[in-house]
């Protein structure tokens, strides 16, 4: 478009800070929220009350990408396989802590606890990168992390990936088994990212932005960039995103109920 774009990262508080910044800005189409499944779906499952409504406070623009979660442990830690990790969790209850930088990663870990029939204890962090760093340093013993943020640390040996929570292995880390291959049949977990604006934004501006994102998502360089970071394009405009978001909120509420996670 020839227009300058300023990226303003606002981590922390389960995305509440970023959401507040977007919703308090002028609704003129110049402030776009690029949010994850945590802010746009998972928070609705984890919190009794939210300072925002992930559906009615936003007008969807476009789905952007999704990335399978990695189950990571310290690179020099004792666990070399998922079976070894689960074995310790069962034989020595209470000895393993997981890091969680958002509501999404917390529910992934609790879903893992439920599927593996173990109990690891959550330690909250301000953001996903802090949780990943805590695993690399051994401050916590495991975490679920986005492929895009953890793969370089896995390649360097600072982290060890025990499994990728997807139906098939990731081309970005082909040596890492799927959770099913590693001994946890059917376990999958993805993070996704989508774009939205305040629902107070005029429809004309919303339509322009949605069309722009549609064009961006079809560019070969967009697909190449996502593949390089271990993600994949998620194509879908406002209506597709609206339906997808509704399904995701239902999914994460079901996961929270099944894993017996109490709402905060």
Predicted regions and their residues:
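Short secondary-structure boundary segments
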Residues: 36-37, 75, 146-148, 166-167, ...
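Short, well-ordered alpha-helical scaffold segment located
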Residues: 77-78, 149, 168, 178, ...
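N-terminal (or domain-start) structured segment
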Residues: 1-56, 93-96, 104-105, 117-144, ...
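An extracytoplasmic/periplasmic, membrane-proximal ligand-sensing/linker region
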Residues: 155, 203-264
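Stable alpha-helical elements in mature extracytoplasmic
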Residues: 14-18, 38, 42, 81, ...
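Hinge/capping helix and adjacent helix->loop/strand transition within the periplasmic-binding protein
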Residues: 24-30, 45-130, 179-181, 192-225
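Short beta-strand->loop
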Residues: 51-64, 99, 119-124, 141-142, ...
């Amino acid at each position: 478009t020839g227009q300058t774009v300023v990226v303003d990262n606002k981590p922390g508080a389960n995305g509440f800070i970023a959401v507040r910044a977007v919703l308090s800005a002028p609704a003129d189409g110049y402030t776009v929220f690029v949010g994850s499944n945590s802010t746009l779906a998972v928070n609705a499952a984890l919190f009794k009350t939210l300072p925002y409504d992930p559906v009615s406070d936003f007008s969807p623009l476009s789905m952007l990408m999704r990335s399978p979660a990695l189950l990571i442990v310290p690179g020099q830690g004792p666990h070399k396989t998922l079976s070894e990790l689960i074995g310790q969790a069962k034989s020595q209850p209470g000895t393993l802590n997981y890091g969680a930088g958002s509501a999404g990663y917390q529910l992934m870990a609790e879903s893992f606890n439920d599927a593996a029939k173990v109990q690891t204890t959550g330690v909250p962090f301000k953001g996903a990168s802090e949780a990943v760093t805590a695993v690399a340093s051994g401050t916590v013993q495991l975490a679920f992390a986005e492929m895009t943020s953890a793969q370089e640390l896995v390649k360097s040996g600072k982290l060890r990936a025990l499994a990728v929570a997807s139906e098939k292995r990731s081309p970005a880390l082909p040596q890492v088994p799927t959770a099913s291959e590693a001994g946890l049949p059917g376990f999958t977990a993805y993070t996704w990212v989508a774009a939205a604006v305040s629902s107070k934004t005029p429809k004309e501006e919303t339509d322009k932005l949605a069309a722009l994102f549609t064009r961006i998502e079809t560019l070969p360089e967009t697909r190449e960039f996502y593949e390089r970071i271990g993600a994949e394009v998620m194509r879908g405009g406002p209506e597709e995103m609206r339906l997808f978001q509704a399904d995701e909120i239902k999914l994460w509420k079901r996961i929270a109920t099944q894993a017996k996670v109490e709402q905060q």
